[in-house]
Amino acid sequence: AYWLLFTAYALEYRVQETDFATLRAQTLANGEILPTFEEYLIQAKKNTATKLIIEIKDHNTPARETRVVKTILKMVKQHKLVNDVEYIAFRQFVCDELVKYGPKGIKVAYLNGTLTPEYCKGLGYTGIDYNLKVMQKNPQWIKESHDLGLTVNIWTVNDPEGIKWCIDNKVDYITTDNPAEANRQLGSKIDFPK
């Protein structure tokens, strides 16, 4: 089984190296058990208004990464969520495999911050998803990305100044652990849990 790792819960196990029973026995900080990817997809079908962003973590070998990519793509298709999912990964090989094996129009964004927007576009990616510090060093990448039809997400932006920088520079998405502050700055009407 493939697992979704909730890093916010700081489990003390490496998912790839831990057996199913051990992982399943863990209680997360919020009192829930760690869901399988299958359970995550079942829950996601209940709220298709929410876009699913699936991050595929690095694995030990390219063969294993290819197997993980193919399995995830198959499961997403089986659950009829193909149009409700976008994929992100730090490893270029994983992004390449998603483009290679995924359906036409698959949405893939590269996370590592080492490739230019033009290069990402040439690889068939649909976005860049870089750390705030990378983008602050390369702010021209926002306009370049948009001119190429790529989306721009910046992670993980929690402080008010960083959120303001993202908004002022017209990024498409902000990954944050502080959605209330992002909401406040955007003037949105979305109610986030406290």
Predicted ranges, named:
Residues 2-107, 146-148:
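Metal-dependent phosphodiesterase/phospholipase catalytic core, i.e.
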Residues 107-194:
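C-terminal active-site rim and adjoining tail of enzyme catalytic domains
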